[in-house]
Amino acid sequence: TRNVMVCRMSTEPEWVESQIAFVNEEWREQSELPRIYNRESRHANTTRHDVVIHNARLDEDQYNLDGCGYTLINHQTAVTDFHNKEVIADQYFPEMKSVILDLTGAHAAFSFPFYQVRSKNPANFFDAYSLYMHCDFSPDTWLQFAQHIVKESGSSEEYPEESWDFALYNFWRPIENPVEKDPLVLIDARTVERKDIINYRLIEEGDKAQAAVPLFNKNQRYCYFPCMKLDEVLVFKQLDSRTEKSLVCPHTSFIDPNAAPDAAERQSIDIRFMCVFPKQT
């Protein structure tokens, strides 16, 4: 019998201690952007910090998309093969679109044309689980990308920014087996300061491929959901143009000290939706 983590104890422990890599503080005041595009550049531009990561399952009455920026839902999918692109497009995207509309009350939701299935042994650096705290999009350029998603969807409606607000969400789900190691950790969006978010590039040269990373701040609160099961989906916010809502929920994977030595490798699927809301007047 394998010595796997006992998932019935998902409400324990209350917290774990681990290390999370953050972009180096030296980049805070630089006009040039850091570049992280492979293992070597990640090591050169990040520093590990000792942190306490709280068990979010104990705070079920506290988490929501507009406050802390994340929520955990139960969802039984009809999809049995997450490696089949046609099945993902024809079945999983429509399933999740229905969920995000119900969760947010958005006027409309548009799926991103790409998604990621992550594993420990990926085809390239960006298909691996991330090992540094990051945001998937830049707060400075994401609204242009949101409009691009609407246009590419073939929508007959237009959503000018003076009349509509936008929010980006991730759906993160384990596949093949429950999460026994390398779970996802999130920063509670209520503890993220805008001044701590800086842009970076995901390529070695040029001025394309821009995203964002948070700098370490001792006031940040870190949370995770231990032992995520196959019928659980972690929904979290990427960005939001509504000023009264939380802005962003940075995230990464981390080494769980409670994982068994022979724990199964984590596999997960990550898809994204852009939602539109009429501006409140």
Residue ranges, per PLM feature:
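Non-heme Fe(II) oxygenase catalytic core, chiefly the N-lobe of the double-stranded beta-helix
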Residues: 6, 15-212, 219-220
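Catalytic core of Fe(II)/2-oxoglutarate
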Residues: 211-281
